[in-house]
């Protein structure tokens, strides 16, 4: 309801989306992906769970990010971000969800993530990983598909260099990590 009150969006990027996770503050264990999908008819959902653990009752509890798109969605990826050990702070696995959407201006990659909060070291490594993923996508955008990549699991779909990164970066605008993620290649 809140999203609809804010406006009529073609693409919505969300973080901290839970499925069957009653242990989270404010959660009843609901399937937030299903509830959001029901409230956003006509949108394709791309969900990426960073955390996927047993719920203790024979099911699974998941926590991650989601992209909801009213625009046509091509290929989608769910990239687990690095999670190196940092014994001095609590931390959790993080994910970047990426989808190619077709807008009036052409194909565009939309990415959403939620970087580590407590560990500066992990967050900096995650920023490096996102930059690496973007560089990889830019390289793929200029590559012509091979004949063997037509149809089936090897099919190469358009993956444009143009991208928008959304999310909870867990750093202020003045942080070095912001300059790091925005630095030109």
Regions inferred by a protein language model and the residue ranges of each:
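Short, conserved active-site loops that position catalytic residues or coordinate cofactors/metal ions
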Residues: 7-21
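Active-site phosphate/pyrophosphate- and oxyanion-stabilizing loops and adjacent acidic/basic residues
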Residues: 34-35, 179
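Membrane-embedded segments
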Residues: 20-32
